[in-house]
């Protein structure tokens, strides 16, 4: 049997390890989705370069190739890009929360500036107007 102090330390270590594993898992998933997003971007660029819109194109799904109409393929990849963007953004927002929980469990202060969001185009325009005048 472990002493109460040893059990408390063990619970603490297990909690920190679980939180760290969740952070690493999300980071890995973001990297994987970003890789897929880059591959889609390459595919869209190749479709834009190809001027023969009337022809069918070969698309790779896993380990098989399928012949599809050019416009349908482009639309499908664009929808996939939108889905990937949303999923990556969702994971990034979850990651911020998980990192803060991990820091809290370790007794470290919360990261400053970690929850900052970029300015929207409208906010940038307003800021430029204020700075000029």
From Swiss-Prot:
GO MF entry, a single one: unfolded protein binding
What GO CC annotations are associated with the protein? cytoplasm; prefoldin complex; RPAP3/R2TP/prefoldin-like complex
Q: Does the keyword Chaperone apply?
A: yes
What subcellular locations does the record give? Cytoplasm
Q: Does the keyword Cytoplasm apply?
A: yes
InterPro entries cross-referenced by the UniProt entry = PDRG1 (IPR030482), PFD_beta-like (IPR002777)
| The organism's place on the tree of life at top rank | Eukaryota
**Main subcellular location of this protein, as a coarse class:** cytoplasm
Q: Which UniProt keywords apply?
A: Chaperone, Cytoplasm
Biological process per Gene Ontology, one example term: protein folding
Function of the molecule: May play a role in chaperone-mediated protein folding.
Quaternary context: Component of the PAQosome complex which is responsible for the biogenesis of several protein complexes and which consists of R2TP complex members RUVBL1, RUVBL2, RPAP3 and PIH1D1, URI complex members PFDN2, PFDN6, PDRG1, UXT and URI1 as well as ASDURF, POLR2E and DNAAF10/WDR92.
Q: Describe the family membership recorded for this protein in Swiss-Prot or TrEMBL.
A: Belongs to the prefoldin subunit beta family.
Q: What is this protein called?
A: p53 and DNA damage-regulated protein 1
Q: Which organism is it from?
A: Mus musculus
């Amino acid at each position: 049997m472990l002493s109460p102090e040893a059990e408390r330390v063990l619970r603490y270590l297990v909690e920190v390890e679980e939180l760290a594993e969740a952070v690493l898992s999300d980071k890995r998933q973001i990297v994987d989705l970003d890789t897929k997003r880059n591959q889609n971007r390459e595919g869209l660029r190749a479709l834009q370069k190809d001027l023969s819109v009337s022809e069918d194109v070969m698309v790779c799904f896993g380990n098989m190739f399928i012949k599809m109409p050019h416009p349908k393929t482009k639309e499908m990849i664009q929808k996939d890009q939108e889905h990937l963007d949303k999923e990556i953004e969702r994971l990034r927002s979850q990651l911020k929360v998980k990192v803060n929980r991990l820091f809290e469990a370790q007794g470290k202060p919360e990261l400053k500036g970690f929850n900052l969001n970029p300015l929207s185009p409208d906010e940038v325009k307003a800021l430029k107007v204020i700075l000029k005048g």
